[in-house]
Amino acid sequence: MIKNRIKEYRAIFDMKQEELARLVGGRRETIGNLEKGRYNPSLALAWRIAQVFKVPIEDVFTVED
């Protein structure tokens, strides 16, 4: 299972789901589903999200057994 800290980083950056979605070329619903663990991102999307927050991808996403 892939866990993420998207919501935490959005709070740090005072960013709404809509804004993050726009910056990564996605939809608000996708960001919401990622945050709730309902959807695993593609590598490209995960990389773009990490770029927005200016952190390594592994700071945002972790894999748990």
Where in the sequence are the language-model features?
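Short basic helix-loop element that most often maps to the first helix and adjoining turn
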Residues: 4-23
